[in-house]
Amino acid sequence: LRAFLVCVLFVVMFATPHSSQAVDETITIGVLTSISDEWAVMGTATVRGVELAIAEVNGRGGVHGRKLQLLVEDTREAHSGGHAVTAYRSLRQRNVKWLIGPAGTGAAIALAPIAAADQVIVISPTIGVSEFSSAGANIFNVRGVDRHATEYMAREAFKAGWRRVAVLASQQPWDTAQGEAFASEFTRLGGVVVSRESPLSDANDFQTMLVRALATKPDGMFLSHFSRIGVIGKQLKRLGYTGPKFSTLLDPAAVESASGSLDGTEFANFAGPRGSFISTFQATYNVEPGLGSDTAYDAVLALAKALDESEDEGVATVSKKLSTVSFDGAAGVVTFDRDRIAVRQVKRFIVRHGRIEESRPAE
């Protein structure tokens, strides 16, 4: 009898499906974004977009019957990309391989080569440079490339009669890239950059730089400092500057912090959130959708769709499927080009009475 019981126990242990290598009952989505520094508003919006997408996917049964769950790591990347690598490794130690993020260019540059060599898929909802996704076939950019919008604004400035421009772009990599793009396109058209200022990304006093820039008597100013644009607007106003101001990206929170000093500022950006996403977000969080919320939502839906349609969960298989997805998302129709960058329409915006309003479709 004892021999029989031992035999039965042996059979049960080794015949039980997935006994020691059970398929996880949930699929973990890791989020890498800033939630405790100057980019916390964008980071919070990103996390909330992911939460709404996870709720939607789980509400319709999950992926192959498995529910999605969320893990968030704070990248604190407003001034440095180094923390993003630490956050990434923390998620990887917990075997998370489906990742949304990081938030900005510095982290993207630091993280892309590491992720490209790893068994993960990374989709950023807020990075606006092409260098990120070009690092590997498993890296995706659902935001688009901001350079196109910046170059468009340079053409619009020249068309409006600007021939002399002052450029202020911080040393944060994304800010710097936009300043370079604007200056390059403006000079290509025949304009002259009469002043170029490059403050530190965490600077708060811009008066000396602004006085120096205004002394060159520019026809207009191009401002690229995502985390301090509101401060710059206030200081320009105190100096009596009333001329035109162009930028490439303004966040509603930054505009609000500027206390009206950014009124009249024009910029080009991708189309914002639309449809039922706006009402659902407002009903859930009692605030308007912020930068990154809609694209984070779309990133999760794109990943869930790719997972659902893939024959297995190998990174190569899912990456290939993800590159072909197409659906109507919160930020518009989601499709990727051959470099795994979302194809998105650029629109022109203006700040009026402390609020961002759509001006007209861009080219």
Question: Which residue ranges define each predicted feature?
Answer:
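Extracytosolic ligand-binding ectodomains
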Residues: 4-10, 16-363
